[in-house]
């Protein structure tokens, strides 16, 4: 999550459930329902909390949304920096890229006005690879995947995108400064099984 300490009391935001607190009325920014990241987050909540509690959480959180839903993470970070909202759900690496100046000086200044908060445990999105059943170069494909799973390959894959490396290797300093966290133990299979229900609950709650 990304927050503006001048708009919200960050000591009161520890978890995703806290975004449903009435004190955040008009201060929450979210991407639209089509975002697979948010669909997975809701599926994660269903697995951990159950359908009933997730439905109640969604209803209260959506009532706190400050304005129409955003098309992407960067626009949310900008809105938080401009105090149009106080907290938003985003992927950390968008903030990291902005801080690094990848998007230009203006976005770097916006990002510096915000702070990244990571719940413990945190919902984690992953990058994955596989080998097609009828691939003609299976041996080479397997070697490539094995390289990406190595410390060197993991670091090389994560560095330009500011993601967390798969292996225990040195992280980008910007990402490292966001702090340590515990990944949620929910599996990809679990998220896939609950995805359709997650979308339904999001729609029912008014998450457009």
What is each PLM-predicted segment?
Residues 86-110:
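A ligand-binding cleft/hinge motif common to bilobed small-molecule-binding domains
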Residues 1-84, 98:
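Extracytoplasmic ligand-binding site segments that recognize negatively charged/polar headgroups
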Residues 50-63, 106-109, 180-181, 190:
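Short, solvent-exposed loop/beta-turn-alpha elements that line the ligand-binding surface or hinge
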Residues 52, 163-208:
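An extracytoplasmic/periplasmic, membrane-proximal ligand-sensing/linker region
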Residues 1-7, 43, 125-138, 156-157:
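A bilobed periplasmic-binding-protein/Venus flytrap-type ligand-binding module shared by bacterial periplasmic
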Residues 26-34, 58-63, 67-70, 108-133, 147-171:
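Periplasmic-binding protein-like
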Residues 24-28, 83-86, 111-113, 138-141:
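Loop/turn elements at helix/coil->beta-strand transitions in domains of secreted/extracellular proteins
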